[in-house]
């Protein structure tokens, strides 16, 4: 399968499994799972060719491991990044490493300095244990800035952290006092 097909399909899946399942008449359960046959049928109604082999290839080859298949192979979901109100994945609380990172664009710094990191339309703020990963994320939005999060002190102050299946760290928000520019 060619890279463009995989990337285009990944973007489509991100859209319908994270944000707008109703765009193709798809229903997600509370944990974000969608029936694969319903997804394929909805994609076909939207004029997109999608089959189980392509879905499997996207799940297997996605560099950020954004998607997961159920154990029985009948359902698929986005691992994290949801903005859809019906989805509330029950991530287990986890103890974060001492420092986590967040990549952003320089144009967002004034807002972050004032409000901290907030999830925006998503359910969680996304953090990384790797500087390089966070910088890569920041580059998607413009001139990248790396933020260092004092996750240990934040956790000790009572803020909950979760880790998605793909290794992304999640929290509800990051107050200003735990953020410094790296």
From Swiss-Prot:
InterPro entries: Ptrans_KptA/Tpt1, RNA_2'-PTrans_C, RNA_2'-PTrans_KptA, RNA_2'-PTrans_N. It is an enzyme of class 2 (transferase). Its EC number is 2.7.1.-. The keyword Transcription does not apply. One of its GO terms (molecular function) is tRNA 2'-phosphotransferase activity. It comes from the Bacteria. SUPFAM superfamilies: ADP-ribosylation (SSF56399). Pfam families: PTS_2-RNA. Keywords: NAD, Transferase. The keyword rRNA processing does not apply. One of its GO terms (biological process) is tRNA splicing, via endonucleolytic cleavage and ligation. Removes the 2'-phosphate from RNA via an intermediate in which the phosphate is ADP-ribosylated by NAD followed by a presumed transesterification to release the RNA and generate ADP-ribose 1''-2''-cyclic phosphate (APPR>P). May function as an ADP-ribosylase. HAMAP family: KptA (MF_00299). Belongs to the KptA/TPT1 family. NCBIfam families: PRK00819.1-1, PRK00819.1-4. This is Probable RNA 2'-phosphotransferase. It comes from Pseudomonas aeruginosa (strain UCBPP-PA14). The gene is kptA.
């Amino acid at each position: 399968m060619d890279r463009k097909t995989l990337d285009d399909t990944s973007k489509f899946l991100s859209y319908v499994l994270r944000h707008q399942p109703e765009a193709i008449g798809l229903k997600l359960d509370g944990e974000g799972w969608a029936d694969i046959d319903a997804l394929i049928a909805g994609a076909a109604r939207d004029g997109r060719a999608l089959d189980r082999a392509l879905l499997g290839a996207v799940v297997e080859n996605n560099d950020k491991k954004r998607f997961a298949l159920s154990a029985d192979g009948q359902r698929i979901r986005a691992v994290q990044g949801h903005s859809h109100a019906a989805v509330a994945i029950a991530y287990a609380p986890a103890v974060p490493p001492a420092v986590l990172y967040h990549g952003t664009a320089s144009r967002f710094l004034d807002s972050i300095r004032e409000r901290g990191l907030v999830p925006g339309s998503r359910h969680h703020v996304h953090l990384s244990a790797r500087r390089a990963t966070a910088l890569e994320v920041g580059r998607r939005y413009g001139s990248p800035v790396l933020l260092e999060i004092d996750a240990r002190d934040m956790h000790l102050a009572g803020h909950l952290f979760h880790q998605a299946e793909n290794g992304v760290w999640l929290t509800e928000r990051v107050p200003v006092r735990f953020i410094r520019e790296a």
